[in-house]
């Protein structure tokens, strides 16, 4: 048997880790994908890129539905809230989704709603993995509000409630002993310390997969620390009960490099997408696979159509989104996203599809149509700069990331601003376009584009904020379970 595990931290195949395990059964005709084996291909495969160390993978799971969640009570750091029967079922479903994923260590908040979730997740495994209960995963300390319902809190402390909703990083509360403190500031210190300790035990140069089970606020803070603490990031994220977020960490030129593989996936639950609020929603999809994706060729603005697997991915996305009410649809004017959008819309007859050049892929100029090995022959230093500091690179006769950022974000804002609050729009575009849009929404910068994974056929959901003074919410990012497995198994090719 031949098994291939491939990880990529960017669009390029130079940053790919390849692991081959051989047995005496001979070599099957298999094609390699992002984290496993799929499809038929020839026996011989070449890798025109250096092999690098496996990254550290973090599986971040929020606890299942609790008694206080149902009652809409503030839980914070108290341990009065218990896991409900629904929460127990959610934990088991999470465990089943992760059953085939090797996990080297598990850490959990000691609060019973999280500890019970961890027990449920691990109960379906056969490896006897025991969790470590770590105070570094305790939930945010909201002592003065503990046990209050959301309505009671708004009545008793309207000023504090407004600050919590609009500027949570600035919230100050008073403990029973009279001391003043800032809950989010304290929690960020806690998150930094937890991650520092975790990475000392599980270095990014290793190959560990670590399960971390915690609470809404502490997990948000962990994510913000991983992303470099973008300004106003706390309200840009959504984490549902029993959701899974996957982060890959690898050695970088400055410390470690982070990649969001997926965020707030509840595809193992029903319904498979977070509930829509009262404002507009946008469903962002990357186009299906092309032959050039598979080969690792830089496509850019060369109009390569979907291959057979790309059409199958579009069909899988159609099935995954079938129950979603779509009111409008937008696509890049290029063939591969347009074909993907048309495939998804087969379940949404009558929904008009608008194509726009604003969502076109980055122009790679003279790099288009070339493999990385070919690009390296003529632009070795520029290609390395593209990997290390993409915001500094002017593509030869092509675009910069800033160029793509400006036109894609402007196009996105035009689409979002044109939606009625009740509407949901489908938007299908490309890797670089989606990355720049999502970096913008997460409060990141053009230099951070490698932090966002966008698999072929992957689904991302963005919700417009209830409060117009607040940023849009990334409700989930790069869902690919409809393409097979809880981890992203899409091709690790170039743009």
Question: What are the language-model segments listed below?
Answer:
Residues 15, 29-31, 41-44:
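Intrinsically disordered, low-complexity segments enriched in serine/threonine/proline/glycine
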Residues 46-55, 92-162, 315-384:
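Phosphate-coordination/substrate-recognition cap region in phosphate-metabolizing enzymes
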């Amino acid at each position: 048997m031949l098994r291939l595990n491939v990880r990529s931290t960017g669009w390029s195949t130079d940053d790919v880790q390849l692991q081959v395990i051989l047995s005496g059964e001979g070599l099957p005709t298999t094609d390699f994908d992002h984290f496993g084996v799929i499809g038929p291909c020839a026996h011989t495969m070449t890798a025109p890129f250096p092999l690098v160390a496996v990254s550290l993978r973090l599986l971040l799971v929020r606890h299942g539905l609790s008694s206080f969640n149902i009652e809409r009570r503030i839980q914070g750091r108290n341990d009065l809230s218990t896991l409900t029967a629904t929460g127990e079922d959610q934990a088991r479903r999470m465990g089943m989704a992760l059953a085939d994923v090797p996990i080297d260590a598990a850490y959990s908040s000691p609060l019973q709603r999280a500890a019970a979730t961890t027990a449920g997740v691990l109960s379906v495994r056969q490896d006897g993995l025991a969790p470590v209960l770590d105070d570094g995963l305790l939930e945010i300390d909201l002592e003065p509000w503990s046990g209050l319902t959301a309505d009671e809190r708004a009545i008793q402390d309207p000023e504090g409630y407004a600050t919590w909703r609009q500027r949570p990083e600035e919230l100050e509360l008073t403990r029973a002993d009279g001391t003043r403190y800032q809950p989010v500031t304290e929690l960020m210190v806690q998150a930094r310390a937890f991650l520092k300790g975790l990475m000392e035990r599980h270095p990014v140069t290793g190959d560990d997969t670590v399960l971390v089970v915690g609470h809404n606020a502490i997990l948000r803070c962990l994510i913000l620390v991983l992303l470099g603490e973008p300004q106003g990031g706390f309200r840009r994220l959504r984490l549902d009960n029993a959701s899974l977020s996957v982060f890959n960490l690898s050695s970088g030129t400055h410390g470690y490099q982070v990649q969001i593989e997926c965020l707030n996936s509840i595809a193992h639950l029903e319904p498979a997408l977070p509930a829509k609020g009262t404002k507009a929603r946008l469903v962002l999809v990357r186009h299906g696979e092309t032959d050039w994706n598979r080969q690792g060729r830089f496509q850019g603005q060369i109009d390569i159509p979907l291959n057979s697997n790309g059409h199958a991915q579009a069909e899988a996305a159609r099935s995954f989104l079938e129950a979603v009410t779509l009111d409008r649809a937008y696509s890049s004017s290029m063939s591969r996203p347009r074909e993907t959008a048309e495939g998804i819309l087969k379940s949404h007859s009558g929904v008009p599809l608008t194509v726009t050049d604003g969502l076109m892929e980055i122009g790679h100029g003279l790099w288009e149509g070339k493999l990385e090995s070919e690009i390296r022959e003529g632009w070795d230093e520029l290609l390395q700069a593209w990997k290390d500091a993409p915001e500094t690179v002017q593509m030869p006769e092509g675009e910069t990331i800033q160029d793509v950022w400006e036109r894609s974000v402007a196009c996105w804002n035009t689409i979002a601003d044109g939606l009625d609050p009740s509407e949901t729009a489908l938007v299908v575009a490309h890797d670089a376009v989606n990355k720049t849009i999502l970096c913008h929404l997460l409060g990141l910068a053009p230099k951070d584009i490698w932090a966002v994974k966008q698999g072929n056929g992957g689904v991302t959901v963005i919700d417009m904020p209830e409060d117009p003074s607040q940023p849009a919410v990334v409700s989930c990012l790069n869902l690919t379970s409809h393409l097979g497995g809880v981890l992203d198994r899409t091709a690790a090719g170039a743009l």
